[in-house]
Swiss-Prot record:
NCBIfam families reported in the protein's UniProt record: GGGWT_bact
Classification of source organism: Eukaryota, Metazoa, Chordata, Craniata, Vertebrata
Subcellular location per the Swiss-Prot or TrEMBL entry: Membrane; Cell projection, Axon; Cell junction, Paranodal septate junction
Taxonomic source organism: Mus musculus (Mouse)
The protein's name: Contactin-associated protein-like 2
SMART domains given in the database record: 4.1m, EGF, FA58C, LamG
Tissues where the protein occurs: In sciatic nerve predominantly found at the juxtaparanodal regions (at protein level).
Modified-residue entries (Phosphoserine), positions: S1304, S1307
Length: 1332
C-alpha cells in the first residue's frame, strides 16, 4: 500500500548534490588556499587593549612579534592571573595558529597561557582541545618564537591571551602573532517568531541524497532549527531540546503494517552558550552522518525506505503553524544562523537578496543581536563579593546557575546587627536555604526545593525573606515554591558572597559551610537590583578571587561519551565516571568484555558443557551473545539457536506465491558472522519431508525451494551438497529414489520422501530464510526443519607465530586506538628481554616489552610525556610457559596485567592530550634496532580484532606459523593420569590409559550391575624374546605391565555404590594360589584380602568404622609396594598397613580380574566362596588396576576390549559421582552465570547435544523435569503400597473403597480421575513423553 503511494511520485525531481564543501560559508577560504597569513602585524595600536600596562612604553600596541618598539613588548602593571592582552581584527577572521615571544631583551616572558576568542569582545570562549580548556606552552626565553598550530580552526573578531605562568625571575612580558585568513558569511537573526522558508519549485521534493549544513548560536535551550514534512508521513526536524541537538527523521512508515520509520538521534550539549556551532547532515538513503562541531555520529534510519518525500517547503528557524501536531508545543528558534545550505542552495544568500518569495519571515534581520547577560565562571577557590543595601527589612536575591557538581556554596551573607546569616547551598542536587537567626527562639530555619539541578542546564534561584516569612522559588515554578512562616528577623547586610566565602578560606569557624561552587552564574540580582558585573570586574565596588567575568567555561565531559557499549556517563566538574552495570563490560570506560571470546576459552578455564555468554570481538562493538558450548569432544561445538527448530508444515504455495520462512536467531547476523569467521568448521542441518512437493526441480528446472544465507544471498543447493551444485545429498552420493533426479523430493512421488543433510560451507551460513514454492497441488505437502548453527574450533585462540631470532618482526597496519586501546596476547620465551610490539607516531608511541626476566613494561606517549607501567613477577617469565599480557589505555587511565598478578594502574592527567596519534606500521616482535623478541606469541588481539599472526608468518621470510609446546603450560589440565598430546592448534588429552573419559579425562566411566552379572578381564603374559626387547624398548608403561608376569606393586582405585551385602567388588586371580579381593561383608564393612604366599591365611584389612552398603558412592584407592599397603577411603586420611614378614612380595602370574562375581575354576578361598552368591548389585565406576581399565574396555572400543568377557548386559552409569573438574565459581563472582543478563538475548528450545530440531519443542531441561517426576511417582507408589497394607491389615474383613462416579466411568482410571482432580494432573504428566 505504501509502495503504491510512493510510486505516484516517481516523476519528482531527482537532486544531484554538487559537492560537500558547499556546506561551508561561500566566502570561506578554499581548501586549496592555505589559511596562514599573519593577522596582527599590520594592525594599528588602537586595535590592542589590555588589563593594564606598566607604562606607556609597555602599551599593548607594542606586542607585535619580532618588533622592538616601545619597551620591546607589552607588560602589565602587576604580574598576576587577572592580566590579559586583547586584539581586535576589525572583522571576523578564521584563525589557524598562534605564536608568542617574550619582551625584547628582557627576563619577561610567559611560559603558559590560554587563548580566548569572541565575535563581540564579550562572552568569551576559551580554546578547547582534547575535551579540555587548553593551556598552550609558552616561551623559555625572551627572543625565541614558539608557534602552535590549532588542532581545529576557530572564527572570531577578538582574541584575548591570558597568561597563566611566567618567568619566575622576571615579569609578564609578551609579543604575539595570530595566523589565519579572512572570513565572511551571511548571518540571519531569528527573533523567535518568524521562520525562513525555502519553497520547492514543483511543490514536492523527493531525494535519495541530502546534504544540509548550517551554523547557529543561541542562548535558548529550546528551538526548531529546520523542519520539512510530506503528506505521506515523511519528515525531517532539527531542533534544540535542553540545549542538545536532536535530529528526527522518518523516510516512511506503514500505519497498517510493521514498518515504523521514526528515527531520533541526539548530539552535543550546552549548546545554549551563545557561541557558534556548526551542523552538517549527510544522508545517502538510510545511512546518515550527523556532524556537530567536528564530532560525527553515524547511524541508519529505521524502516525500509530510502527516499525522503517533502511537500511544498522546508523551513528554517521554526515550524509554520498548520494545525498539525508537529507544529504545536515546539518553540521557534531564537538566535543567529549563518551559512545555511540545503542541497547546494545557499539559503542565507537567497534570503539576503530577497529571492525566497513571499513568506512569514517576520522580523528577521541580517546582523546578529547579542544577549545582555554577563556570565561569571567559578572554580574551586573562587568567590564573588557584591555590595548590598544595608539595614533593609527585605532580603531579596535571585540568580541563575549551571553546574555538574551535586554540592556547593551558592550564596552567603551576614544580617546586620548580628541577627545571624543566610546561606544558600546546592546539596545533593537540591537548593537548600539555611537561616541562622540569633534573636528568635527558632535559631535555625532550613528549607529546600528542586531536584537534579546539577544537570548542566541553567536554573534560576529566587529567594525572598522578611519578618516571619521566607519563600524559595526554583526555575520560576511558583506552584512548587517552598514557604515558611517561622519566627524570623531580617536586616540586610552590606556584603553578599557568591560561589564562596572569603572567611571560609581564612577562618576555621566557618568550616561548616559547603565547598565552593564550581560552575557559572548570570543575571545576579541583589535587593532587586541587577548587579553590574563589569564594575565588579574593576573592583568598584565589590571584589572577587579566581573568577572569570564574561565567560562561562563549563565543559560537558560526557559529550562525546567516552563510556562505551551503552555505559552510563555521570560527571562532576573535573571528571566523569562510567557505570557499566548490565552492559556485559567493565573497566573505567566500559571497554573490556567480562565474557570470554569463545567456547574454546571457557573449555580451558575448566568449564563443562552449558550455556555461556561469549563476546567474539571482545571490546569491539558487537556485544555479547548467549550460546550453548558442547565440550564433550576434543574440539568444542558452539551452538547458536533460532526460533524455527521444530518441524514446520508448508501447504498451499506455488512459484508465484512463495512461502517465506524467516529464521530469527538469538544473535545478530554480525555476531554470528564473527563466530563463523573465527571457527574452523561450521554446519547447519536442513531437512525437507515432501509429498508431491518438489525441492530443487533437478536436473534442469528452476528451483522451487531455496535458502538465503549470509549477506542475503540465495543458494540453490541442499544439505549434504556443495555450493554451485544444484543437488541434494542423494545426488552427490548417487542413491536418490529416482536416479533421474538429484533430490528425492524432485521425483514428485505421492509417498513421503526426505532430503536432508548438513550445510557446511561456512561463508554461506547461517540460514536466515527458506523459500518454498511447490505445495499448492492436491495432496502436496512439505515439512521443513532447520537445525541450529554449529561451529567447531576457534582459529583466533590458537593463532600464533614463532619468532626465530631477535631481529625478526611481523608488521601490520597502523593501530587505531586514539582514545581507547586494549591489547592482549600470550607469550612464552626463554630469553630475558625483548620487544613484543611497537607503533610510532610523530611524537606519540605505544610499546609493550619484556624488560627483564621478571618485568613486563607498557609505555606510551599521547603528548603529555612518556608514561611507563611495569608489572614485576615474583617468578621468572622466561620459563617457556605461556603467560598472558593485558594492557589498556583510555582517557581516564592506563593499566597493565600479567597472568593473575595484581593489575598496575596509572591515572591520566585531568588536563592534557588524550588522543594517541600513530602513523607508522605496527611492528610485532621488535623493530628499529631494538632487542627483538625470541619465542612465541599467540592470540594477539587489539581492540577486539585478532591479528592473523599465522597468515602473516606464512608470507614473511624466516618465520614459522604456529607454536609448539602447549603441553608445558596446559598439560596439568589432563587429569587422572591423562596424557597431553601436542597439536598444531593447541593440545588434547589422551585418556586411553585411564579409567576416565571426556575432554580432560575427568568424566567417570561406570556401569550398573544387576544380580548375577559379572565381568572378567584376562591378563596376557607372552614371553618376551631377546629380539622383541629391542623393538619394544619404546613401548608405553601399560604394555610393560601387561608383559610382566609377576607384580611387586599394584595401584587399584574404583568407586562403587550398593545397598546389598555381602558381595564381591573386585577379585584378581592367578595361575598360582595368589589372589587379591575387595569385598563387602554382611555387616556392610569393607574388607581387603591379600594372599601372596608364605602365610597360612590371607592377610585381611577390615574397615569397621562405617557401613559401606548405604547406597552412597564410595571411593576406594589401594596401593601396594612389596609388603606395604596404603588404603584411602573416601575423604578419610590414608592409612598404612604391612604384610607379615613371612609373606612374599610378588603377586605371581596374575590371570584374571573379576568385577561383580567370581567365576573361576579351581580352588577358591572360603570367604570369597561364601560371599560370592548371589553377586554384586549396584554401580561400579573409575575401575583401574595399574594401567588397565576393565570397565572402560568393556564399554568403549579400545585395544583391551578383546580381553573382556561379560555375563549380562552392562548399563553405563557414573554411579552418581560428579565429574572431577576445577572448583566452580560462585554465582556471585561467575561472570558467565546464566542468571546474568538473561534479558539481553532470547532463548529458543533446542537440543544442543544432537544439534538438530526437537520435534516437540522439549529442551534439555526435560531430563531434569523427568527425573523429578520419576521421584514423585516413586514416592506416591510407595505411599500407596503402605496404605493398602494398612487398610487390609485385618484378616477376614472386607472393605470397599469405591471412587465416586464409578458408575458413570468407563474404566477404573477414569473413575479415579473423576473423583480426584489432582490425580488427573499426575496421569497427564505420566503420559507425557520426555526426552532424557
Amino acid at each position: 500500500m505504501v509502495m503504491s503511494l510512493r510510486a505516484g511520485y516517481r516523476a519528482a525531481l531527482s537532486l544531484w548534490i554538487l559537492s560537500s564543501f558547499i556546506c561551508r560559508a561561500w566566502t570561506a577560504p578554499s581548501t586549496f588556499q592555505k589559511c596562514d597569513e599573519p593577522l596582527i602585524s599590520g594592525l594599528p595600536h588602537v586595535s590592542f587593549s589590555s588589563s593594564s600596562s606598566l607604562s606607556s612604553s609597555y602599551a599593548p600596541g607594542y606586542a607585535k612579534i619580532n618588533k622592538r618598539g616601545g619597551a620591546g613588548g607589552w607588560s602589565p602593571s602587576d604580574s598576576d592571573h587577572y592580566q590579559w592582552l586583547q586584539v581586535d581584527f576589525g572583522n571576523r577572521k578564521q584563525i589557524s595558529a598562534i605564536a608568542t615571544q617574550g619582551r625584547y631583551s628582557s627576563s619577561d616572558w610567559v611560559t603558559q597561557y590560554r587563548m580566548l576568542y569572541s565575535d563581540t569582545g564579550r562572552n568569551w570562549k576559551p580554546y578547547h582541545q582534547d575535551g579540555n580548556i587548553w593551556a598552550f606552552p609558552g616561551n623559555i626565553n625572551s627572543d625565541s618564537v614558539v608557534r602552535h598550530d590549532l588542532q581545529h580552526a576557530v572564527v572570531a573578531r577578538y582574541v584575548r591571551i591570558v597568561p597563566l605562568d611566567w618567568n619566575g625571575e622576571g615579569h609578564i612580558g609578551l609579543r604575539a602573532e595570530v595566523y589565519g585568513c579572512a572570513y565572511w558569511a551571511d548571518v540571519i537573526n531569528f527573533d523567535g517568531h518568524g521562520v525562513l522558508p525555502y519553497r520547492f519549485r514543483n511543490k514536492k521534493m523527493k531525494t535519495l541524497k541530502d546534504v544540509i549544513a548550517l551554523k547557529f548560536k543561541t542562548s535558548e535551550s529550546e528551538g526548531v532549527l529546520l523542519h520539512g514534512e510530506g503528506q505521506q508521513g515523511d519528515y525531517i526536524t532539527l531542533e534544540l531540546k535542553k540545549a542538545k541537538l536532536v535530529l528526527s527523521l522518518n523516510l516512511g512508515s506503514n500505519q497498517l503494517g510493521p514498518i515504523y520509520g521514526h528515527t531520533s538521534v541526539t548530539s552535543g550539549s550546552l549548546l545554549d552558550d551563545h557561541h557558534w556551532h556548526s551542523v552538517l547532515i549527510e544522508r545517502q538513503g538510510r545511512s546518515i552522518n550527523l556532524t556537530l562541531d567536528r564530532s560525527m555520529q553515524h547511524f541508519r534510519t529505521n524502516g525500509e525506505f530510502d527516499y525522503l518525500d517533502l511537500d511544498y517547503e522546508i523551513t528554517f528557524g521554526g515550524i509554520p503553524f498548520s494545525g498539525k501536531p508537529s507544529s504545536s508545543n515546539r518553540k521557534n528558534f531564537k538566535g543567529c544562523m549563518e551559512s545555511i545550505n540545503y542541497n547546494g542552495v545557499n539559503i542565507t544568500d537567497l534570503a539576503r537578496r530577497k529571492k525566497l518569495g513571499p513568506s512569514n519571515m517576520g522580523n528577521l534581520s541580517f546582523s546578529c543581536v547579542e544577549p545582555y547577560t554577563v556570565p561569571v565562571f567559578f572554580n574551586a577557590t573562587s568567590y564573588l563579593e557584591v555590595p548590598g543595601r544595608l539595614n533593609q527589612d527585605l532580603f531579596s536575591v535571585s540568580f541563575q546557575f549551571r553546574t555538574w557538581n551535586p554540592s556547593g556554596l551558592l550564596l552567603f551573607s551576614h544580617f546586620a546587627d548580628n541577627l545571624g546569616n543566610v546561606e544558600i547551598d546546592l546539596v545533593e542536587s537540591k537548593v537548600g536555604v539555611h537561616i541562622n537567626n540569633t534573636q528568635t527562639k527558632t535559631s535555625q530555619i532550613d528549607i529546600s526545593s528542586g531536584s537534579g539541578l546539577n544537570d548542566g542546564q541553567w536554573h534560576e534561584v529566587r529567594f525572598l525573606a522578611k519578618e516571619n516569612f521566607a519563600v524559595l522559588t526554583i526555575d520560576g515554578d511558583e506552584a512548587s515554591a517552598v514557604r515558611t512562616n517561622s519566627p524570623l528577623q531580617v536586616k540586610t547586610g552590606e556584603k553578599y558572597f557568591f560561589g564562596g566565602f572569603l572567611n571560609h578560606m581564612n577562618n576555621a569557624s566557618y568550616s561548616a559551610l559547603q565547598p565552593s561552587f564550581q560552575g557559572c552564574m548570570q543575571l545576579i540580582q541583589v535587593d532587586d537590583q541587577l548587579v553590574n558585573l563589569y564594575e565588579v570586574a574593576q573592583r568598584k565596588p565589590g571584589s572577587f578571587a579566581n573568577v572569570t567575568i564574561d565567560m562561562c567555561a563549563i565543559i560537558d565531559r560526557c559529550v562525546p561519551n567516552h563510556c562505551e557499549h551503552g555505559g552510563k556517563c555521570s560527571q562532576t566538574w573535573d571528571s566523569f565516571k562510567c557505570t557499566c552495570d548490565e552492559t556485559g563490560y567493565s573497566g573505567a570506560t566500559c571497554h573490556n568484555s567480562i565474557y570470554e571470546p569463545s567456547c574454546e576459552a571457557y573449555k580451558h578455564l575448566g568449564q563443562t558443557s552449558n550455556y555461556y555468554w561469549i563476546d567474539p570481538d571482545g571490546s569491539g562493538p558487537l556485544g555479547p551473545l548467549k550460546v550453548y558450548c558442547n565440550m564433550t569432544e576434543d574440539k568444542v561445538w558452539t551452538i547458536v539457536s533460532h526460533d524455527l527448530q521444530m518441524q514446520t508444515t508448508v501447504v498451499g504455495y506455488n512459484p508465484e506465491k512463495y512461502s517465506v520462512t524467516q529464521l530469527i536467531y538469538s544473535a545478530s547476523m554480525d555476531q554470528i558472522s564473527a563466530i563463523t569467521s573465527s571457527a574452523e568448521y561450521c554446519e547447519q542441518y536442513v531437512s525437507y519431508f515432501c509429498r508431491m512437493s518438489r525441492l530443487l526441480n533437478t536436473p534442469d528446472g528452476s528451483p522451487y525451494t531455496w535458502w538465503v544465507g549470509k549477506a542475503n544471498e540465495k543458494h540453490y543447493y541442499w544439505g549434504g551438497s556443495e555450493p554451485g551444485i544444484q543437488k541434494c545429498a542423494c545426488g552427490i552420493e548417487r542413491n536418490c529414489t529416482d536416479p533421474k533426479y538429484y533430490c528425492n523430493c524432485d521425483a514428485d512421488y505421492k509417498q513421503w520422501r526426505k532430503d536432508a543433510g548438513f550445510l557446511s560451507y561456512k561463508d554461506h551460513l547461517p540460514v536466515s530464510q527458506v523459500v518454498v514454492g511447490d505445495t499448492d497441488r492436491q495432496g502436496s505437502e512439505a515439512k521443513l526443519s532447520v537445525g541450529p548453527l554449529r561451529c567447531q574450533g576457534d582459529r583466533n585462540y590458537w593463532n600464533a607465530a614463532s619468532f626465530p631470532n631477535p631481529s625478526s618482526y611481523l608488521h601490520f597496519s597502523t593501530f587505531q586506538g586514539e582514545t581507547s586501546a586494549d591489547i592482549s596476547f600470550y607469550f612464552k620465551t626463554l630469553i630475558p628481554r625483548g620487544v613484543f610490539l611497537e607503533n610510532l607516531g610523530n611524537t606519540d608511541f605505544i610499546k609493550l616489552e619484556l624488560k627483564s626476566a621478571t618485568e613486563v613494561s607498557f609505555s606510551f606517549d599521547v603528548g603529555n610525556g612518556p608514561v611507563e607501567i611495569v608489572v614485576r613477577s615474583p617468578s621468572p617469565l622466561n620459563d617457556d610457559q605461556w603467560h598472558r599480557v593485558t594492557a589498556e589505555r583510555n582517557v581516564k587511565q592506563a593499566s597493565l596485567q600479567v597472568d593473575r598478578l595484581p593489575q598496575q594502574i596509572r591515572k591520566a592527567p585531568t588536563e592534557g592530550h588524550t588522543r594517541l596519534e600513530l602513523y607508522s606500521q605496527l611492528f610485532v616482535g621488535g623493530a628499529g634496532g631494538q632487542q627483538g623478541f625470541l619465542g612465541c606469541i599467540r592470540s594477539l588481539r587489539m581492540n577486539g580484532v585478532t591479528l592473523d599472526l599465522e597468515e602473516r608468518a606464512k608470507v614473511t621470510s624466516g618465520f614459522k606459523s604456529g607454536c609448539s609446546g602447549h603441553c608445558t603450560s596446559y598439560g596439568a589440565n589432563c587429569e587422572n593420569g591423562g596424557k597431553c598430546i601436542e597439536k598444531y592448534h593447541g593440545y588434547s588429552c589422551d585418556c586411553s590409559n585411564t579409567a576416565y573419559d571426556g575432554t580432560f579425562c575427568n568424566k567417570d566411566v561406570g556401569a550398573f550391575f544387576e544380580e548375577g552379572m559379572w565381568l572378567r578381564y584376562n591378563f596376557q603374559a607372552p614371553a618376551v624374546t631377546a629380539r622383541d626387547t629391542g623393538s619394544r624398548a619404546e613401548n608405553s608403561a601399560d604394555q610393560q605391565q601387561h608383559l610382566a608376569p609377576d607384580l611387586a606393586q599394584e595401584q587399584i582405585h574404583f568407586s562403587f555404590s550398593t545397598t546389598k551385602a555381602p558381595c564381591i567388588l573386585l577379585y584378581v586371580s592367578s595361575l598360582t594360589t595368589d589372589f587379591l579381593a575387595v569385598l563387602v561383608k554382611p555387616t556392610g564393612n569393607l574388607q581387603i584380602r591379600y594372599n601372596l604366599g608364605g602365610t597360612r591365611e590371607p592377610f585381611n584389612i577390615d574397615v569397621d568404622h562405617r557401613n559401606m552398603a548405604n547406597g552412597q558412592p564410595h571411593s576406594v584407592n589401594i596401593t601396594r609396594h612389596e609388603r606395604t599397603i596404603i588404603l584411602k577411603l573416601d575423604h578419610y586420611p590414608a592409612v598404612g598397613y604391612h604384610l607379615p614378614s613371612s609373606s612374599d612380595t610378588l603377586f605371581n602370574s596374575p590371570k584374571s580380574l573379576f568385577l561383580g562375581k567370581v567365576i573361576e575354576t579351581g580352588k577358591i578361598d572360603q570367604e570369597i566362596h561364601k560371599y560370592n552368591t548371589p553377586g554384586f548389585t549396584g554401580c561400579l565406576s573409575r575401575v583401574q588396576f595399574n594401567h588397565i581399565a576393565p570397565l572402560k574396555a568393556a564399554l568403549r572400543q579400545t585395544n583391551a576390549s578383546a580381553h573382556v568377557h561379560i555375563q549380562g548386559e552392562l548399563v553405563e552409569s557414573n554411579c552418581g559421582a560428579s565429574p572431577l573438574t576445577l572448583s566452580p565459581m560462585s554465582s556471585a563472582t561467575d561472570p558467565w552465570h546464566l542468571d546474568h543478563l538473561d534479558s539481553a538475548s532470547a532463548d529458543f528450545p533446542y537440543n544442543p547435544g544432537q544439534g538438530q530440531a526437537i520435534r516437540n519443542g522439549v529442551n534439555r531441561n526435560s531430563a531434569i523435569i523427568g527425573g523429578v517426576i520419576a521421584v514423585v511417582i516413586f514416592t506416591i507408589l510407595c505411599t500407596l503400597v503402605f496404605l493398602i497394607r494398612y487398610m487390609f491389615r485385618h484378616k477376614g474383613t472386607y472393605h470397599t473403597n469405591e471412587a465416586k462416579g464409578a458408575e458413570s466411568a468407563e474404566s477404573a482410571d477414569a473413575a479415579i480421575m473423576n473423583n480426584d482432580p489432582n490425580f488427573t494432573e499426575t496421569i497427564d504428566e505420566s503420559k507425557k513423553e520426555w526426552l532424557i
